[in-house]
Amino acid sequence: GCGGERDKKKRLTMGKIAKKYCRKIFVTDDNPRNENPKKIRNSIMKGCKKIAVEIGNRKKAIKIAIKELGPNEILLVAGKGHEKIQDYGNKIINFSDKKIIKEIIHKKKFSSKKNHYQNFLLKKVFDNNNLRNVNYNNVSINTKTIKKNDLFFAIRGKKTDGHKFAREAIKKGAIKSIISKKIKQLSKNKIIKVKNTFSSLNDLAKATRDSTSAQIIGITGSVGKTTLKNLIGFALKNYGKVYQSPHSYNNKFGVPLSLSNLKRNTEYGIFEIGMDKKGEIDNLSKIVKPETAIITNISGAHFKNFNTLTDIAKAKAEIIDNILDGGNIILNKDDKFFNFLSNKARKKKIKIISFSSKKKADIFLLKTRKVKNCYRLKIIVNKRIFYFDTMYSTNNFINNILACISVLSVLNLDLNKMGKKFINFTIPSGRGDIKMVNKFKKRFKFIDESYNANPLSMLSAIRNMNYYKRKNNSQKLVFLGDMLELGKKSKKFHKELSTLINRSDIDKVFVYGKYIRETFNSLVKNKKGKIFNNLKEAYDHFSKIVHNNDLLMVKGSNATGLNQFSKNIKKGQISAI
């Protein structure tokens, strides 16, 4: 409001300023004095018509504004905080903004209502009158994961239509099914009808992101995203409430689904962002809007849709465009695209934090040494020395440790707290976890890299075999599958693997797949194991040739079936190493 009999020119200006910075404005009376209150309000309204509501009664205006206030939003009640009266010229009213606000908040107790947050989010997304007390717990697009009071989105995918499962979701306890077409035998109070369920899921993700006060971290790169996400989540749990995207939920469905499940009390949110083609990271990071982003590395993981590594680097760099103002980008200084990525970040005025396991950087590895049953890493963080103990010493994992420490440093957290904590971190299954297994009436070391494969991760896994120590005369055996989605460069990349294998101390290489035969055919004779036609043949063969204390490593793209093969091997696991 504006006072009467005061500077009239400022009224329009106040309306314009409010419109620039606020999502909603309530224009009410200040001290009209002897002026017409309606005319004063009209002068302000001219500057902010589309998003302003005119309510002359100041108490009513404050009450409605508080009622509509969402989580983490600020309500500015301006003009009369210092006064205890309202002047209408011929009438003086006892009135205190402070007193009125305290009374309304005390009666409403909105901050402690569990369902206020969810209702606020749903009302931002859906134009629906049937949204009172929709106290949903989680958001799901898969009835296999539905629990009581979850919100189910019926998404149409390539293989199936979620609408087929909308009734099943309700039977399993879903509070609402979001649908875009009529479904028989589903009551109106159990549905929210929309034009497009996928768009609505994205809208809920955006509303959730815009309403959180959590520090949001986005991770992309060609290799190591999921392990790094888990590692950062593991570390941040020592400092506050953490939410991280589950599994490898990094595509156009997984990212908005993960964001929609971000809880109100979360302090740190960690999201993995993947891609298959140009523009995907841009679209997904626009939803995530990270304060801090990490690009782990650039490699030929997507040549099916890209011609060069530079094209892949440009696509990964899209995340930089969507880092919030004043945000940070954490980059691997050992990656050959470091300068390219850092140049883009500088142009965007994004702060760059570098890490390295080979050279000086903001955060870099100085030394690794074996200490009893673990490895002690001496790491320089912004010119200060810190020590961290871990169970793993492979280059991949050390890079993940460095990236994780970079995040902790950016957030100004006490690094000494993590000195001994990394020992308890377990690498996710299929991403380099090491187990001692009892299988085929033998006890041997099993290195599971079977979740996925691209040229960089494959070379790294092969290189790591040189660091694993033999016990007595044990064998080092490798079982490799195809690296998929490499397009025209597939033959070249598969053949190049043989150069590294031939120089390694791997004893025998076994393969299964179409493209990996290029690798096998280029191996020196004494390293050639066998080409398998199916996985049963592979299973039967390993049951005969694996001995006690041998090392067996399995790696290939997920679609090859090697991940399931590895799960069958690990059914007899004893313990992690």
Question: Which stretches of residues belong to each language-model region?
Answer:
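ATP-dependent carboxylate-amine ligase
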Residues: 1-132, 145-151, 157-164, 291, ...
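Short gly/ser/thr-rich secondary-structure transition/capping motifs
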Residues: 8, 59-60, 130-139, 199-202, ...
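Residue-level signal for inorganic ion chemistry
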Residues: 25, 77, 150, 169, ...
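Phosphate-binding loop of NTP-binding sites
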Residues: 109, 116-127, 198-333, 337-350, ...
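Short, basic phosphate-binding NTP loop
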Residues: 112-218, 227-238, 260, 387, ...
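Non-catalytic positions within long, well-ordered alpha-helices that form the structural scaffold/packing
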Residues: 166-171, 285-286, 502
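Short, polar loop motifs at secondary-structure junctions
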Residues: 177-185, 333-336, 357-358, 513-517, ...
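Acidic-glycine-rich active-site phosphate/pyrophosphate-binding loop
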Residues: 228-232, 367-386, 433-434
